[in-house]
């Protein structure tokens, strides 16, 4: 049994081996033919073997593994030999996705905090000591010192010539200062007896009437001594005589005195007789200012300052790039003739200097301006003036107390009243020599009585009875009441020159006199020596860069004396002048009795008294105060504040003579210069209206302080109160010195005298619209405009002189007159300050600029929603074309806000170094760069061939409502289109929303602190060029801010009753009042100090601008360079205060397109573009509205494909619904755009010759009327002065007409038309465009009528001593205009000054012409499809659905059941059968049909039958192939069986669709668009064919959805066998449509091998589309 069993087992083993071998052979495909009979035979044996194997087969099978030794099967075909395929297997886990699309550019980072100021630069070497600087400008007047003790008596003056001197008569000296009222003197000697007058009508003595005004002055007596005539009646006061010439007058001839008149009535107690020269009296009040003295000697040089750090001497280098303004360098060594530096800013006012010695006596000054009336406080009584002319007889005095005087002599004097006004000197009565009487006892000073009402002039009293027995003195009567001040007497003969009185205390600052004619320009002063610069942070440097315009500076040194201006109005009567007998000042004597009537003395100072009778009609007075504001008058000259000239730098190479510069505005107040040579005396003006106030004493001029050392720039001080106007200084010589650190703007000085009008400057580069500054000081009065239409009735004028009539009721306000013709064009103002090199922050919306040239039409934008009309702006400059970004989603326009109030003025950036004065602007600033779309994936892009064909132009979208006008961006040069990136998600909301509707404008608040510079928002993509918006309706005028501190003057009251009191002591300087709310819009305010520079925005290739280095020494002036390029716009600053509209600069040439800027996020939607000029595209046919199917379940989102080729542009869809405004995005990080490197900014060229005069700007709107000044004393009208600074901003003028339409932008490149794109999500609200520049100013309003006269009875106290310098006050209100300077002699033209600091950035020039189109960039790849749009609004109900029975099968290629696409219904789910192979023949299923989705899975889903009615299942070497999932093969590569197969088999769904379904293939990596009228079901990869065992397989119809698999896999199917196993085998191939470029269609294909990770880059994309129903 054993051997037999062994044999059996051996046979069995052999059979098994044979079966195994054959099975292997069969598995490996050895049986190539269809008739493998041997195989069948062996197979039979094999079956027997199987039945005989229970359990043993596996054991035996292991030896069978030696099969590889047999050479039968080619080793690589089936999986056993596939070990090297392991990496491939890993590949099936999913190849790496295509490179992700680049993310959106990050938002720009939030700008960092302002850094602290950098440390000061390293000090340079010490320079050699410069030459002596020019004399510094006189310091501000020191505070008045306390009055010094009376000086010693001066030398006695030379006696004047006495012509016609009556022998024996003494000439009177000039009037001394009034002494303290003496005690009543003892009665004088009796006067000579007068002749007996005719008896008067005796009336009962009435109560004493108030003193009447003095009667009119009598005629001057003839000039020879005639016989004594009867006493004449008092003559009528003549008008003030014309002032004599202002030469130093010799004493006049003494006119012979007329005969003595009859004896007058007893006078008031006369002045004390001349005693010995008394002790000097107390210091009287300061007399009127004398005429300006001759120019003083040049002061001794100041103490040289410490040496500054020397600068390194610079050679003339090539023009370097312009650095940012560095810290001030030390002074350089002056080698040869260096160019003169600019004169520094005013230093801080020095401490008051010590009171200097009195200078030599100057020529008589021109009469000072009347001080404002002092407040009545009891002053000390002045010494009696000369006796006035004899007045007419007053009312009868009180009856004397039985004092018959002896024989007509004076009655016994009553107790002395308070001193009367000075009488005219009496005639000498032939007394050969008047001996001075003894001084009377000093009377107690009376307090001033209340002023009585002005009485009528009494009739002449009766002549007193002659007193026969009047030899003895009568009893001393009680003191009479104080008489009224006497009339001004005729001018007496000039007395002998008295000693110089002590200077009085400073008087109050007088009201501004009328503006004199402009003096001729003075000759240039001698050249000063350069000052030294001391680096001391606390001291203000000499001139830094020009500060922002400060308050008008103090007047410069006096020019050579100009001709006399027109006669000013007579000042108010001053305090008694200081004409005394020459000699030492005695102590005031007591009041003597009145002497006999002396000769007519020189005119006493004007007395203060009641108004006399109405004189003859005077010449026309000055205009009264402003009337009610009329329509705005013509625009005055634009005033500019010119900084004080710094010391001139070293002489530069002489430039060619420029055109005459424009007249500068007032500079900072200079310290008062030395008095100029006296001008001629002006004619006497008309008497003013109203009671003259008492003049305040004139203040003493302080000595000039030493020049302060340059300080480091301090923080800007508060604006000080305006100082007193100084006299016009002489022009200093240019100093030689280096510019100091830029100081802070000094405290506003006293308004200087206005400079002459400058010649018209060349147009500066237009700055960005500045904000309106606070009102400047009242400028010089502008030229009279043409008469306006009759304005509304003014308020009642001040009552004329005379008894006030009954006040009529004020008339009602008349209607405003119609608009007058535009005023005469003002002269061009100075060019603005040079701008910074670095562009400042972008301002808020500028005012409307002039209309740009019309750009060519851009492509039509999507219609925006109707915005509210914006304020009419001028069209901005045309921007250059930005990089062509991927079109952003259309944003809905936000609601347009009404224009907000002007924002606060942003800080100025650091001043740039001096730029040259440019010719009229070259190209304008580059517009903001739009955000480029996300860059597409640029892998494997042939940049040369990327650009696609130009498509047809899309249909013109509907014109949307006009959105707010965006600023027109300058077009960038077209960038190379990147591949279209994936549509990004909607960007973060732009930083700035549209302004909401503004409420009614609130009162303007005080300016807030300057905010730090905001972060740079993402630049929006440039909107398409909007149609210029319709000019908005005129905004509601803001409600006027509260008036500033000073209210308008009220209507003049009736003249007060009473004599104006004496001047009170000067009150202490009041604290600065709280700032009023800002008045109506003022002139452009002075620029703030530059803020710390904002962080520079990211810029293109050039690095950020470094911190400013220390400035080098000034190089020699280079030749004029070309204008530097515009700087990159800085971060947008806060809005500055609105400036008044400057004159419009000439249009710049159209700029070249700028380079691209930083890509930002999508900007706000641009306004409606001008319709494009492209040809209209063909309209797509509209599909019929089908019946609506049921909504299917949403499919799973496919993974994004590789970016497809950009499809043709579809027709423009209708505007999407308005999206909600997004939240503000965080600032993105700058993304480097395609912008080429921008060269560094060139050095600014030297100033070009002034360009031709630009066309006149449109007249600005008149500013509001400034506060009324105090009523000036009316004078005769002066010659019209130079045009004043602009007044305060008037009410808004009548709305300007719309700006000229901007030039049409160049035509954009036509877009590439594609298929109709799917509707994207509504874009987020873009950033609101900048407000257009300010509209064209309206026509000039009519000139307002003069305001009502100010009150004329304000009595001003004397100034107190100045307190210590307080902290700078808030900026004061606009001071009244200073007096008009006298016409100076025209100076010779000075050397050209050094180049100014660069002005502020001009407004962008007008848009340059569009550059030629660049060559078209290569066509970008189309971006991947955007995410699905938001669901559309609900459509109309469809027609009832009909089951059409169209089936589509969708394969998930995962283990999840797929969802049917939207619009289809699920019928069932199953497993994805690809094809089956039986009997070595394959038959495939169309994956798009239901046959490919079997509801059940089996590795052998079929059986085979023969004609013998025998069927076999799972009995042969047959296969089934199923779509597989990404499940990776097991590492062992062993076949998978059982339930482990489940994860490998794809699931499918059969869906019923309402319409035909088909697949479209792009044969590119772009996803094709569905044809019009078809909608997308899914996108995928174009699967064509597959083969596996025996090279059998099948394919897909490309029109079938089965040819578009949603997942690409190199092995998309798995092979399963009847024996229950599945696996991937190396002979399985999948075939996919490849990508074909158009240019490669008829060329030999280039072989290539793609590895994992790049497979998808050459597989065609497809989309399954369903016809819309």
From Swiss-Prot:
GO terms for cellular component: basement membrane; collagen type IV trimer; collagen-containing extracellular matrix; extracellular region; extracellular space. Keywords: Angiogenesis, Basement membrane, Collagen, Disulfide bond, Extracellular matrix, Glycoprotein, Hydroxylation, Repeat, Secreted, Signal. Lysines at the third position of the tripeptide repeating unit (G-X-Y) are hydroxylated. The modified lysines can be O-glycosylated. Contains 4-hydroxyproline. Prolines at the third position of the tripeptide repeating unit (G-X-Y) are hydroxylated in some or all of the chains. Residues 196-214, 367-376, 413-424, 436-448, 784-802, 1247-1258, 1413-1428 have a biased composition (Pro residues). Glycans are attached at residue 126. InterPro entries: Collagen, Collagen_IV_NC, Collagen_IV_NC_sf, Collagen_Structural_Proteins, CTDL_fold. GO terms for biological process: basement membrane organization; brain development; branching involved in blood vessel morphogenesis; cellular response to amino acid stimulus; collagen-activated tyrosine kinase receptor signaling pathway; epithelial cell differentiation; neuromuscular junction development; renal tubule morphogenesis. There is a cross-link at residue 1651 (S-Lysyl-methionine sulfilimine (Lys-Met) (interchain with M-1533)). Residues 28-172 form a propeptide. It is found in: Secreted, Extracellular space, Extracellular matrix, Basement membrane. Residues 289-298, 497-508, 535-545 have a biased composition (Basic and acidic residues). This is Collagen alpha-1(IV) chain.
